[in-house]
Amino acid sequence: MKKKISRLICAVACCVPVALQAQTSEKITSPVNLYKEGKELFLQKNYAAAMPPLRTFVRQKADVNLKEEAEYMLVCSAYELKDRNAIAQLRNYLDTYPDTPHANRIYALIASAYFYQGNYDEALALFNSSRLDLLGNEERDDMTYQLATCYLKVGNVKEAAIWFETLKASSPKYANACSYYISYIRYTQKRYDEALKGFLPLQDDAKYKALVPYYIAEIYACLLYTSDAADD
């Protein structure tokens, strides 16, 4: 009898850890925990790590609203990781959820993806379908810089200058870059005094110090020629 009781106790003792392990595993992989894990990693900008739990969550029978949000994080992660199919994924999300509150940002992300591809006309069309002022400050500044650069690339220097001036007034991060491109635009417009005023402070800038001496020398030469011509 004692042997039977001992065997029964041993059997129960062996089963308890297995049951607890199963419960723990189920808790970890439950839909709500997968969503929370993916979202936390996404907010930490750990996009590669965020995708597996979010994908697993989406494949399960999940809350409709949470599924929409999880799919939003997935397509944004694809953009951040420069997935070659990111544009298609972002567009598909808009087709699936046309009333999403994230539409404005997704249009901006598609525009940015086109910008990085060098497709400036498409980027401009999408940037102009977005309200960049509604984005977070850092992302707004990044995309305003891309917008201004797109205008410069397609030869619309007037709009490029407007956007570079706008960004320069609000973003210390892009102040020198904007000064350089504004000065370059003024140089191409033969507004040499304005161009020189912008180029001179950039002579010690790590990014532009190799470029600006050429323009400064050219401007001085043009101003000297203009002065000599006036004297004649």
Q: What are the roles of these predicted feature ranges?
A:
Residues A22-R55, R59-Y72, E80:
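N-terminal leader/linker segments that initiate helical-solenoid repeat arrays
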Residues Y225-D232:
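Conserved small/polar residues in nucleotide/adenosyl-binding loops
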Residues T24-I28, V58-K67, L94-R105, R131-D141, ...:
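Short solvent-exposed coil/turn linkers within tandem alpha-helical repeat scaffolds
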